[in-house]
């Protein structure tokens, strides 16, 4: 099984898809990586040679932030916004949507399960 950046790549998938299993690499970046290293996107990860794997590993390590480093950077950015007290930081602190979405209805993913308010009755 091919292993890149601490992630086991699925054996049966094409490299173009298999690379997207690494946090921080999507389809577009996957294509860029394969073009830069000269590895065929149609090659299955089980068919990768050691030399192809080394090329991919070297390219990803030297030019991209992925997995743990990227997760830490994102968390640090969120912490910084909370500390400086900007609007986005306040929204993060309150557990509400950060990017201007409506909250009167919807936003349940961010707000969590619905909490019923005691003593509120419908008018007849």
UniProtKB/Swiss-Prot annotation:
Region Disordered, annotated ranges: 95-124
One Gene Ontology biological process: translation
Gene3D superfamilies, per database record: 1.10.8.50, 30s ribosomal protein s13, domain 2
Keywords: Ribonucleoprotein, Ribosomal protein, RNA-binding, rRNA-binding, tRNA-binding
Gene Ontology molecular-function annotations: rRNA binding; structural constituent of ribosome; tRNA binding
Alphabetical list of SUPFAM superfamilies matching this protein: S13-like H2TH domain
One GO term describing the cellular component: cytosol
Quaternary data: Part of the 30S ribosomal subunit. Forms a loose heterodimer with protein S19. Forms two bridges to the 50S subunit in the 70S ribosome.
Function comment: Located at the top of the head of the 30S subunit, it contacts several helices of the 16S rRNA. In the 70S ribosome it contacts the 23S rRNA (bridge B1a) and protein L5 of the 50S subunit (bridge B1b), connecting the 2 subunits; these bridges are implicated in subunit movement. Contacts the tRNAs in the A and P-sites.
Sequence similarity: Belongs to the universal ribosomal protein uS13 family.
PANTHER family according to UniProt: 30S RIBOSOMAL PROTEIN S13/40S RIBOSOMAL PROTEIN S18 (PTHR10871), SMALL RIBOSOMAL SUBUNIT PROTEIN US13M (PTHR10871:SF1)
NCBIfam families: uS13_bact
Name of the molecule in the record: Small ribosomal subunit protein uS13
Biological source species: Rhodococcus erythropolis (strain PR4 / NBRC 100887)
